[in-house]
């Protein structure tokens, strides 16, 4: 019944294929290009060939799927998929599951007229060449003419051979050779029968169907009559009943032999077909599973690379923004330093201008005095000249001291800037350390991925091992069933003749049981070895994980410690800079006090000389102090603004870093969630696959759709987050531009204020000079009267005060030189400390990098060794399996030889006891059993060759 249902299915599939081929005709003829037509003809010829489509039900279904897809594409007018190139030699590959999308689409173009047309010449040529090759390869010539008329048994034989022809499309080439061998034997028995040609009737029908429809399709043909089986028992009864007619009995025995041979061939055919079906189905399931797993892996890798690229782009943007902020900060600091220099230069130039103007005014006054004092004594003139010379020297010394102090201040400011640059360099080194930490984390992720790949490889090897074990068990079961069937046949045949053979058979059964026990023991030992090796591998993997995590924790702790040390050093440097700035402010205040004291001394001297000039000088001094106070206020405001701007930048940076960290955490959570979902779906698919094979494709499609939706949602979220981050970056840039514009406006306003103050000071100076001139003219007369009395007193006081001033200036110079020396020593010590710290940090970095590289190489070596060990174990196990199979085969052969030897002995014993008819019947049965044994030996060798080829492919 099962064979009949299979034949009906085959005929339905062939009829469906015939209809597909007929429907293709108008679309192939309407193709515009000749190359496309030739390609379609080649594909149709490939589908019509039995060697290309494959054997069994699955091969025909695959062929019909190809034909349906080609017809669908021809209706659409576009050739895609596998039909863009010529067909490959060998059997057709199974269509992937995603090709079913083509069948779901509606047909856009349908043929308006399906009237039969004539084939072009090139199509006929292609198909005729294909027919000739197929007919040449499938014919079995006997070399004699049809002269004899067939008897009733020959008619049955012809029907059976016709049936074999109908089924020959789905049989493997090895089986075809066996079949041709059997038919050649039949032809030898009937020496003058007609030659049996195994030409392909299916191909003729399909090729003829290109003309006016299908002339004789499969579903209109008559089914072949089943052959009635005759057992050897019936033949024995007939032979015993028809003992008289030797001629008729011989003919009947020959017919029975032929029938038994035909039944044996049919039985072997069906067995081979079932085996090929089973192998094809198993291979298709494995290929589908592997393809689906590879597609899922490719999708996951693509999505992972896309997320990594987005993260890298965001990190690059963050780095660019940080660099822009650093550049802006450096430009602002440079502007502040330039403004400081400009202010100092302007103050120095103003001081020099005022001093020059004062010198000019004093010179004019002295000239007037000398003109008034021409009439005085020469002694007074000499004293006045001496005092003027001393004053000029003191002023020159004061100018030199001021220049030296200003130069020292500039040098100290330059050193402060250098220290700031070194601090920035330390910050850059800290950033480099953070980057290296990120690289280490990436390396850690890469190693984790490698571990996952090793896990997948281990799982694949485990699956292959299970598959090999299952194949081995199936082969053992088949061999057991064969062996049991052979033993049962031998028992039935020899139970009639003798009861002595039962003991030998029991001994053989005991040997078989022992062999089974040995095989089971070897399988148990192999399973135990596999379990032990898996436990060892898990232990080694866990140990490696623990060691690697410990090393990562140690590296992270070292990095944290180095960060804390760097922060402490930065705090120390900042405190030292603050102390130096305070010292500089103190020095500047001391210098200002000294300048004020000198100005006070000069004012006292001038008050004694000119009473009215003291008021003007005091007013000018107050104005200068106001200007200096305004300058200090503006400096403080600038410093406050710069500090506020730095605080704002730091706050923005911290916010941005927090957002990046949050995004990374969200991304990792989504990744883990997706991985968990993927693993859960995978498990459910594997479980459902064992229960329902037909529903697997639907579940996979649903899972893929859900996975794609989740990925699209994650992409949308990532896109929204990226857009938000870009908007924040844009806002920060706008804020930076606005702050820069405000700073520029403030600088312009300060410049305008400075110019206005300069103009006011010049106007005030001109008015003061005019007043001085008027007052000097008034005082001239008064000075003439009081000068003579006061000159002596003033000279004495001036000498005493000059000596005091000289002493004070010498003391101040000594103090300032000491302070400068101390500052130089502190700067040199700070430079040495910074250089030492840099060298220590570089050494630590090099040590950490070397350690990490060594550990990485060790891990790689360990992984390689483990992989090699696993490969060696697999090879040894495969060798063990092969040796066990060979041993089983040898033992089977030995058992068969023993059986044959026992048969021969018993035949020799029973030759004298048995009649001639019984002897002939036993000889015939022995010859048939020998042929069966030879056939089974051939089949075992074929199965071994297939096993070796399958293992070599794996």
Swiss-Prot record:
Record has Cytoplasm as a keyword: yes
Species for this entry: Mus musculus (Mouse)
The protein, known as: Centrosomal protein of 112 kDa
GO biological process, one term: receptor localization to synapse
Subcellular location: Cytoplasm, Cytoskeleton, Microtubule organizing center, Centrosome
Coiled-coil segments: 276-954
Alphabetized Pfam families for the sequence: DUF4485
Keywords: Coiled coil, Cytoplasm, Cytoskeleton
GO cellular component: centrosome; cytoplasm; inhibitory synapse; plasma membrane
């Amino acid at each position: 019944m099962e064979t009949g249902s299979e034949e009906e299915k085959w005929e339905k599939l062939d009829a469906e294929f015939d209809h597909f081929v007929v429907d293709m005709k108008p679309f192939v003829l309407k193709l515009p290009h000749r190359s496309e037509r030739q390609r379609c003809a080649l594909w149709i010829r490939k589908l019509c060939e039995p060697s290309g489509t494959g054997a069994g039900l699955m091969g025909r279904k695959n062929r019909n799927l190809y034909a349906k897809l080609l017809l669908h594409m021809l209706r659409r007018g576009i050739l895609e998929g596998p039909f863009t190139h010529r067909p490959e030699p060998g059997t057709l590959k199974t269509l992937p599951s995603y090709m079913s999308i083509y069948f779901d689409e509606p047909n856009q173009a349908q043929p308006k007229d399906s009237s039969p047309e004539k084939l072009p010449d090139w199509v006929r040529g292609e198909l005729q060449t294909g027919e000739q090759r197929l007919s040449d390869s499938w014919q079995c010539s006997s070399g004699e003419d049809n002269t004899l008329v067939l008897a009733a048994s020959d008619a049955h034989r012809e029907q059976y051979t016709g049936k074999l022809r109908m089924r020959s499309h789905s049989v493997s080439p090895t089986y075809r050779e066996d079949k041709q061998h059997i038919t050649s034997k039949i032809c030898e028995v009937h020496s003058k029968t007609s030659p049996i040609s195994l030409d392909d009737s299916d191909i003729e029908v399909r090729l003829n169907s290109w003309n006016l429809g299908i002339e004789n399709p499969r579903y209109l043909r008559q089914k072949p009559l089943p052959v009635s089986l005759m057992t050897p028992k019936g033949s024995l009864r007939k032979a015993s009943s028809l003992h008289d007619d030797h001629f008729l009995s011989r003919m009947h025995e020959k017919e029975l032999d032929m029938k038994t041979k035909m039944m044996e061939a049919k039985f072997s055919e069906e067995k081979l077909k079932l085996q090929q079906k089973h192998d094809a189905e198993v291979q298709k399931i494995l290929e589908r599973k592997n393809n689906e797993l590879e597609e899922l892996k490719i999708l996951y890798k693509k999505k992972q690379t896309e997320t990594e690229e987005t993260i890298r782009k965001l990190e690059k943007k963050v780095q660019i923004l940080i660099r822009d902020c650093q550049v802006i900060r450096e430009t602002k600091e440079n502007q502040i330093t330039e403004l400081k220099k400009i202010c100092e230069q302007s103050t120095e130039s103003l001081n020099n201008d005022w001093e020059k103007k004062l010198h000019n005014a004093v010179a004019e006054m002295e000239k007037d005095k000398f003109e008034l004092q021409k009439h005085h004594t020469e002694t007074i003139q000499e004293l006045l000249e001496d005092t003027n010379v001393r004053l000029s020297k003191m002023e020159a010394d004061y100018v030199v001291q001021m220049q030296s102090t200003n130069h020292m201040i500039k040098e100290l400011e330059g050193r402060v800037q250098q220290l700031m640059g070194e601090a920035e360099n330390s910050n850059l080194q800290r950033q480099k350390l953070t980057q290296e930490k990120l690289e280490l984390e990436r390396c850690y992720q890469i190693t984790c991925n490698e571990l996952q790949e090793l896990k997948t490889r281990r799982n694949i090897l485990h699956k292959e091992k299970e598959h090999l074990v299952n194949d081995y068990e199936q082969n053992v079961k088949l061999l057991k069933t064969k062996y049991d069937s052979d033993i049962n046949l031998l028992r039935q045949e020899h139970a009639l003749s003798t009861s002595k053979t039962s003991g030998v058979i029991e001994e053989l059964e005991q040997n078989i049981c022992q062999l089974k026990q040995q095989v089971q023991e070897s399988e148990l030992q192999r399973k135990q070895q596999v379990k032990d090796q898996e436990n060892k591998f898990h232990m080694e993997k866990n140990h490696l994980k623990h060691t690697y995590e410990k090393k990562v924790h140690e590296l992270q702790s070292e990095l944290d410690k180095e960060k804390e040390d760097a922060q402490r050093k930065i705090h120390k440097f900042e405190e030292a800079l603050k102390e130096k700035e305070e010292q500089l402010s103190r020095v500047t205040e001391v210098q200002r006090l000294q300048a004020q004291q000198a100005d006070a001394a000069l004012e006292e001297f001038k008050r004694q000389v000119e009473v009215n000039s003291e008021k003007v000088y005091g007013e000018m001094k107050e104005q200068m102090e106001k200007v200096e106070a305004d300058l200090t206020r503006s400096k403080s405001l600038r410093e406050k603004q710069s500090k506020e701007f730095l605080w704002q930048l730091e706050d923005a940076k911290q916010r941005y870093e927090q957002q990046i960290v949050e995004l990374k955490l969200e991304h990792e959570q989504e990744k883990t969630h997706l991985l968990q979902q993927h693993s859960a779906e995978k498990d459910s698919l594997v479980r459902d696959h064992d229960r329902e094979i037909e529903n697997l494709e639907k579940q996979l499609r649903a899972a893929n759709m859900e996975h794609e939706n989740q990925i699209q949602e994650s992409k949308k979220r990532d896109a929204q987050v990226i857009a938000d981050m870009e908007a924040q970056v844009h806002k920060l840039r706008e804020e930076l531009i606005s702050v820069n514009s405000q700073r520029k406006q403030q600088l312009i306003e300060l410049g305008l204020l400075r110019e206005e103050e300069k103009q006011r000071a010049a106007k005030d100076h001109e008015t003061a000079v005019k007043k001085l001139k008027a007052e000097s003219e008034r005082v001239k007369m008064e000075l003439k009267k009081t000068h003579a009395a006061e000159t002596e007193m003033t000279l004495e006081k001036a000498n005493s005060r000059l000596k005091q001033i000289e002493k004070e200036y010498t003391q101040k110079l000594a103090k300032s030189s000491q302070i400068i020396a101390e500052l130089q020593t502190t700067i040199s010590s700070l430079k040495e400390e910074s250089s030492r710290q840099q060298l220590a940090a570089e050494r630590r970095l090099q040590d950490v990098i070397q350690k990490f590289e060594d550990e990485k190489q060790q891990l790689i070596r360990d992984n390689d060794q483990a992989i090699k060990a696993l490969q060696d174990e697999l090879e040894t196990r495969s060798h063990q399996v092969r040796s066990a199979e060979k041993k089983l085969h040898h033992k089977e052969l030995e058992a068969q030889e023993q059986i044959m030897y026992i048969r021969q002995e018993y035949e020799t014993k029973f030759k004298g006891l048995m009649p001639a008819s019984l002897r002939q019947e036993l000889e015939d049965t022995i010859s048939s059993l020998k042929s069966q044994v030879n056939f089974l030996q051939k089949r075992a060798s074929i199965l071994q060759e297939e096993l070796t080829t399958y293992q070599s492919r794996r």
